[in-house]
Amino acid sequence: MALLLSVLRVLLGGFFALVGLAKLSEEISAPVSERMNALFVQFAEVFPLKVFGYQPDPLNYQIAVGFLELLAGLLLVMGPPMLQEISNLFLILLMMGAIFTLAALKESLSTCIPAIVCLGFLLLLNVGQLLAQTKKVVRPTRKKTLSTFKESWK
Protein backbone atom coordinates (compact mmCIF):
# COMPACT_ATOMS: atom_id res chain seq x y z
CA MET A 1 0.00 0.00 0.00
CA ALA A 2 2.90 2.35 0.76
CA LEU A 3 4.26 1.89 -2.76
CA LEU A 4 0.86 2.60 -4.28
CA LEU A 5 0.50 5.78 -2.20
CA SER A 6 4.00 6.90 -3.20
CA VAL A 7 3.26 6.37 -6.89
CA LEU A 8 -0.05 8.24 -6.60
CA ARG A 9 1.66 11.09 -4.71
CA VAL A 10 4.42 11.43 -7.34
CA LEU A 11 1.97 11.30 -10.26
CA LEU A 12 -0.38 13.87 -8.71
CA GLY A 13 2.49 16.12 -7.69
CA GLY A 14 4.03 15.98 -11.16
CA PHE A 15 0.67 16.64 -12.79
CA PHE A 16 -0.06 19.70 -10.64
CA ALA A 17 3.48 21.03 -11.06
CA LEU A 18 3.14 20.84 -14.85
CA VAL A 19 -0.33 22.39 -14.85
CA GLY A 20 0.90 25.19 -12.59
CA LEU A 21 3.89 25.77 -14.84
CA ALA A 22 1.57 25.97 -17.86
CA LYS A 23 -0.44 28.70 -16.12
CA LEU A 24 2.71 30.68 -15.32
CA SER A 25 4.56 30.39 -18.62
CA GLU A 26 3.35 31.66 -21.97
CA GLU A 27 6.25 29.95 -23.74
CA ILE A 28 4.89 26.42 -23.30
CA SER A 29 2.07 26.83 -25.80
CA ALA A 30 0.77 30.15 -27.12
CA PRO A 31 -2.75 28.93 -28.05
CA VAL A 32 -3.18 27.21 -24.68
CA SER A 33 -1.94 30.33 -22.91
CA GLU A 34 -4.43 32.55 -24.77
CA ARG A 35 -7.28 30.16 -23.97
CA MET A 36 -6.26 30.06 -20.31
CA ASN A 37 -6.17 33.86 -20.14
CA ALA A 38 -9.71 34.00 -21.54
CA LEU A 39 -10.89 31.37 -19.06
CA PHE A 40 -9.45 33.21 -16.07
CA VAL A 41 -11.38 36.33 -17.09
CA GLN A 42 -14.54 34.22 -16.67
CA PHE A 43 -13.23 32.60 -13.48
CA ALA A 44 -12.55 36.02 -11.92
CA GLU A 45 -16.17 37.03 -12.55
CA VAL A 46 -17.48 34.21 -10.33
CA PHE A 47 -14.69 34.33 -7.72
CA PRO A 48 -16.09 33.03 -4.40
CA LEU A 49 -15.08 36.14 -2.41
CA LYS A 50 -16.94 38.41 -4.82
CA VAL A 51 -19.89 38.42 -2.38
CA PHE A 52 -17.59 40.22 0.08
CA GLY A 53 -16.61 42.81 -2.52
CA TYR A 54 -13.30 41.32 -3.66
CA GLN A 55 -12.83 40.49 -7.32
CA PRO A 56 -9.27 39.64 -8.39
CA ASP A 57 -7.54 40.78 -11.52
CA PRO A 58 -7.73 37.80 -13.95
CA LEU A 59 -4.00 37.82 -14.68
CA ASN A 60 -3.06 37.96 -10.99
CA TYR A 61 -5.62 35.24 -10.27
CA GLN A 62 -4.05 33.01 -12.93
CA ILE A 63 -0.55 33.66 -11.59
CA ALA A 64 -1.62 32.93 -8.00
CA VAL A 65 -3.35 29.66 -8.95
CA GLY A 66 -0.42 28.62 -11.14
CA PHE A 67 2.11 29.38 -8.41
CA LEU A 68 0.08 27.47 -5.81
CA GLU A 69 -0.27 24.46 -8.12
CA LEU A 70 3.43 24.49 -9.00
CA LEU A 71 4.61 24.85 -5.40
CA ALA A 72 2.13 22.35 -3.95
CA GLY A 73 2.90 19.86 -6.72
CA LEU A 74 6.64 20.07 -6.12
CA LEU A 75 6.18 19.76 -2.36
CA LEU A 76 3.89 16.79 -2.87
CA VAL A 77 6.66 15.04 -4.80
CA MET A 78 9.80 16.14 -2.95
CA GLY A 79 8.77 17.67 0.36
CA PRO A 80 8.98 16.20 3.85
CA PRO A 81 5.87 14.32 5.04
CA MET A 82 4.37 17.29 6.91
CA LEU A 83 4.67 19.58 3.88
CA GLN A 84 3.26 16.82 1.67
CA GLU A 85 0.14 16.74 3.83
CA ILE A 86 -0.16 20.54 3.77
CA SER A 87 0.29 20.69 0.00
CA ASN A 88 -2.29 17.93 -0.42
CA LEU A 89 -4.72 20.00 1.66
CA PHE A 90 -4.03 23.11 -0.45
CA LEU A 91 -4.61 21.15 -3.66
CA ILE A 92 -7.87 19.70 -2.28
CA LEU A 93 -9.08 23.22 -1.48
CA LEU A 94 -7.95 24.43 -4.90
CA MET A 95 -9.88 21.65 -6.66
CA MET A 96 -12.96 22.38 -4.57
CA GLY A 97 -12.66 26.00 -5.69
CA ALA A 98 -12.28 24.88 -9.30
CA ILE A 99 -15.42 22.76 -9.07
CA PHE A 100 -17.30 25.67 -7.46
CA THR A 101 -16.14 28.00 -10.24
CA LEU A 102 -17.16 25.60 -13.00
CA ALA A 103 -20.55 25.04 -11.35
CA ALA A 104 -21.07 28.80 -10.98
CA LEU A 105 -20.34 29.21 -14.69
CA LYS A 106 -22.87 26.43 -15.40
CA GLU A 107 -20.30 24.42 -17.34
CA SER A 108 -21.20 20.94 -18.57
CA LEU A 109 -20.38 17.86 -16.54
CA SER A 110 -17.73 16.84 -19.07
CA THR A 111 -15.90 20.09 -18.32
CA CYS A 112 -16.04 19.41 -14.56
CA ILE A 113 -14.86 15.79 -14.74
CA PRO A 114 -11.07 16.50 -14.68
CA ALA A 115 -11.40 18.62 -11.53
CA ILE A 116 -13.65 16.00 -9.90
CA VAL A 117 -11.22 13.18 -10.76
CA CYS A 118 -8.26 15.17 -9.41
CA LEU A 119 -10.19 15.93 -6.23
CA GLY A 120 -11.04 12.24 -5.87
CA PHE A 121 -7.41 11.18 -6.24
CA LEU A 122 -6.26 13.85 -3.77
CA LEU A 123 -8.85 12.69 -1.24
CA LEU A 124 -7.79 9.08 -1.82
CA LEU A 125 -4.18 10.05 -1.18
CA ASN A 126 -5.18 11.95 1.96
CA VAL A 127 -7.19 9.05 3.38
CA GLY A 128 -4.48 6.55 2.43
CA GLN A 129 -1.79 8.57 4.19
CA LEU A 130 -4.03 8.98 7.23
CA LEU A 131 -4.62 5.22 7.38
CA ALA A 132 -0.90 4.53 6.96
CA GLN A 133 -0.09 6.87 9.87
CA THR A 134 -2.79 5.30 12.03
CA LYS A 135 -1.40 1.86 11.25
CA LYS A 136 2.02 2.98 12.50
CA VAL A 137 0.59 4.33 15.76
CA VAL A 138 -1.61 1.35 16.63
CA ARG A 139 0.38 -1.62 17.85
CA PRO A 140 -0.68 -5.10 16.92
CA THR A 141 -1.89 -7.10 19.92
CA ARG A 142 0.27 -9.94 21.12
CA LYS A 143 -1.11 -13.40 20.92
CA LYS A 144 -1.68 -14.94 24.32
CA THR A 145 0.29 -18.09 24.81
CA LEU A 146 0.58 -20.40 27.77
CA SER A 147 3.83 -18.75 28.87
CA THR A 148 2.15 -15.33 28.79
CA PHE A 149 -0.59 -16.57 31.10
CA LYS A 150 1.95 -18.06 33.50
CA GLU A 151 3.87 -14.75 33.62
CA SER A 152 0.71 -12.77 34.31
CA TRP A 153 -0.19 -14.99 37.32
CA LYS A 154 3.17 -14.41 39.02
UniProtKB/Swiss-Prot annotation:
<keyword id="KW-0732">Signal</keyword>
<dbReference type="InterPro" id="IPR032808">
    <property type="entry name" value="DoxX"/>
</dbReference>
<feature type="transmembrane region" description="Helical">
    <location>
        <begin position="112"/>
        <end position="132"/>
    </location>
</feature>
<dbReference type="InterPro" id="IPR040399">
    <property type="entry name" value="TMEM35A/B"/>
</dbReference>
<keyword id="KW-0472">Membrane</keyword>
<protein>
    <recommendedName>
        <fullName>Transmembrane protein 35B</fullName>
    </recommendedName>
</protein>
<feature type="transmembrane region" description="Helical">
    <location>
        <begin position="85"/>
        <end position="105"/>
    </location>
</feature>
<feature type="transmembrane region" description="Helical">
    <location>
        <begin position="63"/>
        <end position="83"/>
    </location>
</feature>
<feature type="signal peptide">
    <location>
        <begin position="1"/>
        <end position="22"/>
    </location>
</feature>
<comment type="similarity">
    <text>Belongs to the DoxX family.</text>
</comment>
<keyword id="KW-1133">Transmembrane helix</keyword>
<keyword id="KW-0812">Transmembrane</keyword>
<dbReference type="GO" id="GO:0016020">
    <property type="term" value="C:membrane"/>
</dbReference>
<dbReference type="Pfam" id="PF13564">
    <property type="entry name" value="DoxX_2"/>
</dbReference>
